[in-house]
């Protein structure tokens, strides 16, 4: 549940200007996640969120830009192990089946990992479609993603 909550927090932070923990608690409640301000405070620390200027004279939560590639891959590996149910590929498309409610956050994490050959993702509730280029790299990318499950 914690990882699902973390994904939701990252998705909210990415798409909205959240300036207080109370705002974040409210957005999580609106998403059906029951959480306290104390839990959100711990989540913010664990996720490494920082406050940055929002361009309107205030501040908002954000992920630090200094995340290393190794940090991103480690985090992606944990998310794959927690959420991925099955994977397959055809031509230049890799399809990843996930636990319900986790595909969007995981798709965003794949995009942020900037994996060579991945040109983008499309995610629904429990399915991610990863588009690769060139087509010849698809099996190699698929194997790299499968390695994250181990």
UniProtKB/Swiss-Prot annotation:
SUPFAM superfamilies in the record: C-terminal domain of arginine repressor, Winged helix' DNA-binding domain
| Entry superkingdom | Bacteria
Q: What are its GO cellular component terms?
A: cytoplasm
The GO terms this record gives for MF are:
arginine binding; DNA binding; DNA-binding transcription factor activity
Task: Name the pathway.
Answer: Amino-acid biosynthesis; L-arginine biosynthesis [regulation]
Where in the cell?
Answer: Cytoplasm
Q: What does this protein do?
A: Regulates arginine biosynthesis genes.
Q: Which family does it belong to?
A: Belongs to the ArgR family.
**Entries under HAMAP family matching the protein:** Arg_repressor (MF_00173)
Quote the protein name from its UniProt record.
Arginine repressor
């Amino acid at each position: 549940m914690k990882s699902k909550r973390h994904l939701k927090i990252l998705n909210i932070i990415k798409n909205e200007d959240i300036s207080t923990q109370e705002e974040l608690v409210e957005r999580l409640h609106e998403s059906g996640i029951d959480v306290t301000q104390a839990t959100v405070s711990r989540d913010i620390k664990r996720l490494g969120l920082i406050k940055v200027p929002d361009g309107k004279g205030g501040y908002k939560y954000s992920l630090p830009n200094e995340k290393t590639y190794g940090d991103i891959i480690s985090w992606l590996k944990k998310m794959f192990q927690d959420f991925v149910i099955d994977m397959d590929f055809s031509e230049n498309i890799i399809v990843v089946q996930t636990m319900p409610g986790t595909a969007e956050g995981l798709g965003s994490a794949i995009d942020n990992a900037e994996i060579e050959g991945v040109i983008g993702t499309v995610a629904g509730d429990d399915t991610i479609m990863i588009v690769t280029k060139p087509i010849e790299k698809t099996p190699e990318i698929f194997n790299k993603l499968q390695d994250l499950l181990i």
